[in-house]
Regions:
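Retroelement reverse transcriptase polymerase core
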Residues: 1-271
Length: 271
């Protein structure tokens, strides 16, 4: 297996070998770049952007771009175009301003769009998002945990072609629209939560807990490899991609949504 996986060394060689074999069998689920990600299959993986009755399109002027970001923005847009995250568009009734954010990694930026005007007219999706405390309560007190992470989470969901123009943003080099679900869109958390619940519903609260694109498999070690397999089978069925760099398999303590825990209880101590 050419990709590096993080696996806890708390178990015997036979058990670790079973985990390695399993990850090799399903290594197609672990792309290393966005271009290799297939996107979630079927209507489940397609987002619509319904608007309130009487909603009128809004065209906003671009925000002023700090000159120190111009070259970085140009390079980031080129990456997004090459990856198919965005595509050029000549004209759109909806235009929102682009926003540039610094990443934690020094020198890198994230391109976002200020979608507040669109969000005001976006029909609300009431699907519930997970409660952090409930997830933590359900995960505590287990023998072993594996933490998996969805690769580019929201971007695995495509925007329906008829709705893409609503995500248009314009800068001095042209106008672009998203082909995949962007961050900052009002219903994105609810839509993503629904997808995850639909895919994994038969496993949730039994040996799997989900928190947006963070999915924790838990239980007894003698059943853990089988539980991991069931989850990976579902991922393959629906063409869900995982980020191997952010996955940790088979550890006796857990770390989820910023809270540490141990095998027997939830606490604030070190993992």
């Amino acid at each position: 297996m050419s990709k590096i996986a993080s696996i806890g060394n708390y178990w015997d060689d036979r058990t670790i070998g079973q985990v390695v074999d399993l990850l090799q069998e399903y290594q197609d689920l672990f792309p290393t770049k966005f271009e290799d990600m297939k996107g979630i299959l079927g209507d489940l993986g397609v987002m619509r952007i319904p608007l309130k009755e009487g909603a009128k399109p809004v065209k906003q002027r671009p925000y002023r771009l700090n000159p120190i970001y111009k070259e970085k923005v140009r390079k980031e847009l080129d990456k997004m175009l090459a990856a198919g995250i965005i595509e050029p568009v000549e004209e759109s009734e909806w235009v929102s301003p682009m926003v540039v954010q610094d990443k934690k990694t020094k020198g890198e930026i994230r391109i976002c769009v200020d979608l507040r005007k669109l969000n005001d007219d976006f029909v609300h999706d009431p699907f519930p998002t997970p409660f952090t405390d409930e997830v933590l309560d359900n995960v505590g007190g287990q023998e072993v945990y594996s933490f998996t992470d969805g690769f580019s989470g929201y971007h695995q969901i495509r925007i329906h072609e008829e709705d893409r123009y609503k995500t248009t943003f314009a800068i001095e080099w042209g106008s672009f629209q998203y082909t995949v679900m962007p961050f900052g869109l009002r219903n994105a958390p609810a839509i993503f939560s629904r997808v995850v619940i639909v895919v994994f519903k038969e496993f949730i609260h039994k040996f799997l807990e989900v928190y947006f694109d963070d999915w924790t498999v838990f239980g007894l070690m003698n059943k853990h490899v089988g539980a991991l397999r069931l989850m990976l089978v579902k991922c393959r069925e629906h063409q869900i991609s995982l980020n191997l760099k952010k996955c940790i398999f088979c550890v006796p303590s857990w770390y989820i949504v910023g809270t540490c825990g141990v095998q027997t209880r939830i606490n604030g101590g070190p993992c």
